[in-house]
Amino acid sequence: MVDYYEVLGVPRQASAEAIRKAYRKLALKWHPDKNPEHKEEAERRFKQVAQAYEVLSDVRKREVYDRCGEVGEVGGGGAAGSPFHDAFQYVFSFRDPAEVFREFFGGHDPFSFDFFGGDPLENFFGDRRSTRGSRSRGAVPFSTSFTEFPGFGGGFASLDTGFTSFGSPGNSGLSSFSMSCGGGAAGNYKSVSTSTEIINGKKITTKRIVENGQERVEVEEDGELKSLIINGREQLLRINTQ
């Protein structure tokens, strides 16, 4: 399971305000518009930071995430009377990282000139240098708006399926992540995480199952199993010749 506290660089007992500050700092650091030379890494980090913030900033989601992680670490089913005494499932559905970013900043993109009414460098990063002429005709802004960033395409649409569209056609499109965990009365523990994305028009689903100390990773392409790894060892797949 992803350690969202590590992603944001905060301790597990971090306050809601500390989590907000961590997200603000990292979202600005890894905003794709700010990292055109490291596009792929920036997109990955920006998305991961947004997901961490969505979970840890929500009291209910954070509680479930914390408890699920604790059960995973001890490998048990939880004490009697705890939420893990009976098996349960909780799914995290993530929004477009750009939507999270805009919402955090009041519906605006802080990298656009309109947000500040002037030079974003002066207002946002505390640089009080003169911005005279920054809005002159033909001037190139610090960065384009996020919706125009090539890696994410123009416009972001949330679908009823729970998936989020954030990619350009032919590259990546739908993306989702779900996690379930639980322990039974016999002390059995099972954690399931599933991620789905569209790559070059193909639906790639990766499912990671951890049950009683054994890890199983399945990768499907358009519903067909392409890879199976058990405890770190890739398994030979039987080819259906019919």
UniProtKB/Swiss-Prot annotation:
GO terms for cellular component: acrosomal vesicle; centrosome; cytoplasm. Residues 1-69 form the J domain. InterPro entries: DnaJ_domain, DnaJ_domain_CS, DNJB2/6-like, J_dom_sf. Testis specific. Expression is confined to the germline without any contribution of the somatic components. Disulfide bonds: none annotated. One of its GO terms (molecular function) is unfolded protein binding. It holds the Pfam family DnaJ. Keywords: Chaperone. It comes from the Eukaryota. One of its GO terms (biological process) is chaperone-mediated protein folding. CDD domains: DnaJ. May operate as a co-chaperone of the male germ cell- and haploid stage-specific Hsp70 proteins. This is DnaJ homolog subfamily B member 3. The gene is Dnajb3.
